[in-house]
């Protein structure tokens, strides 16, 4: 009887601790808009530092003399730049115990951060947003992203060896004391006092001699309505006009 009671108490304590830990996780769900960065907006462009990286980018652009901005062809930038833009495209965060999903109005991109302890799969194809796994360290969400496609015409160029580390945590305007560096922002009259801080560290032995770091600041919004980022429609209409002059 004593052993059974001890077992019940042990299970109860374990369950209570697990529930408490889950309850202590910060609620980062909702709609957020970037309003500032450190370094500032100019710092959102990252040039290769290694001789090999510079040569790779120069060779790429020499091959495509009539280079245009990829965004003009609705090519999504992917990570990390998709999270660094300050053109006031909102992101919506959906938070569950085993997964955090980030929906972006910008190019309608989707990030999935797996929180169930899994490892990066060996047979997963590289993508523009990569493969992200995360865990809570106290009140900080720590995310690692790999399996990224090579993209040399990006504001933050990357190769398949690029790794991105993120530390994400809730804060307030008073604690951060940052000014708006974005194009559009409601920081002058914020709808809430919540600030979501993203600290990024990007490494790539082919491109950089040291980690490239940038911190982004997002403010919580009350309006959860997204507009449709229907980028391909314009290109389709232009193609129809060209085919039927």
Predicted regions and their residues:
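Bacterial N-terminal signal peptides
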Residues: 6-17
């Amino acid at each position: 009887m004593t052993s059974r009671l001890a077992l019940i108490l042990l299970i109860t304590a374990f369950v209570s601790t697990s529930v408490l830990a889950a309850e202590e996780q910060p609620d980062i769900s909702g709609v957020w808009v970037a309003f500032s960065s450190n370094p500032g907006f100019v710092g959102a462009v990252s040039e290769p530092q290694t001789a090999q990286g510079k040569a790779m980018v120069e060779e790429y652009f020499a091959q495509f003399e009539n280079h245009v901005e990829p965004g003009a062809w609705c090519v999504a930038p992917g990570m990390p730049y998709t999270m660094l833009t300050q053109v006031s495209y909102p992101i919506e965060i959906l938070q569950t115990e085993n997964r955090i999903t980030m929906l972006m109005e910008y190019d309608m991109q989707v990030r999935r951060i797996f929180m169930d302890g899994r490892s990066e799969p060996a047979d997963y194809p590289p993508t523009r947003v990569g493969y992200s796994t995360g865990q809570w360290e106290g009140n900080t969400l720590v995310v690692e992203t790999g399996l990224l496609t090579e993209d040399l015409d990006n504001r933050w160029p990357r190769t398949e060896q690029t790794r991105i580390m993120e530390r994400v945590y809730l804060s307030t305007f008073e604690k951060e004391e940052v000014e708006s560096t974005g194009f559009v922002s409601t920081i002058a009259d914020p709808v809430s006092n919540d600030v979501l801080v993203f600290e990024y560290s990007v490494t790539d032995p082919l491109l950089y001699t040291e980690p490239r770091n940038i911190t982004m600041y997002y403010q919580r919004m009350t309006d959860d309505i997204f507009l449709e980022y229907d980028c391909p429609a314009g290109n389709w209409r232009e193609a129809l006009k060209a085919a039927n002059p």
